[in-house]
């Protein structure tokens, strides 16, 4: 059986240079794909880049977490379509 982690936040690991060891541990545990969840425009580009670099193992979503909604929420929402991707 192949497992998918359907909700994780990988940006902190990437920022600390720890992404590859995290992916190695996930694979060793039987997790074949991770879906990293974008919560604000501040992480959307990072997650798209992770997906492009690790297409077989990382997918991503973009959205606004209620804690990150501010006065510019409409501008953020208007950017969402630039992050659409075909299904993996």
Where are these regions (language model features)?
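Mid-domain alpha/beta scaffold segments of enzyme catalytic cores
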Residues: 1-88
